[in-house]
């Protein structure tokens, strides 16, 4: 369940560029997102297969390898940022944006 949750969060991040989630989930999803972008920078078949195995969405993997890999080619890591938003109405969970840097 945890792997599926993180994979879905990263898929949404790749598709939309920014997702709104709890701080805890953002902190957990961030390392996976960074690893997936690093795989996309490699760009070989083995990297693509590893990405498909983790994300389970061919559309997200295509976007990752076609757009994000080339975009971050010269950047040595640090592809995402967490922006805190305050507490959610209802259960007071600390919310944040997990977004891709330019």
Model-based region annotation:
Residues 1-102:
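Structured, basic alpha/beta domains of bacterial-type, RNA-associated proteins
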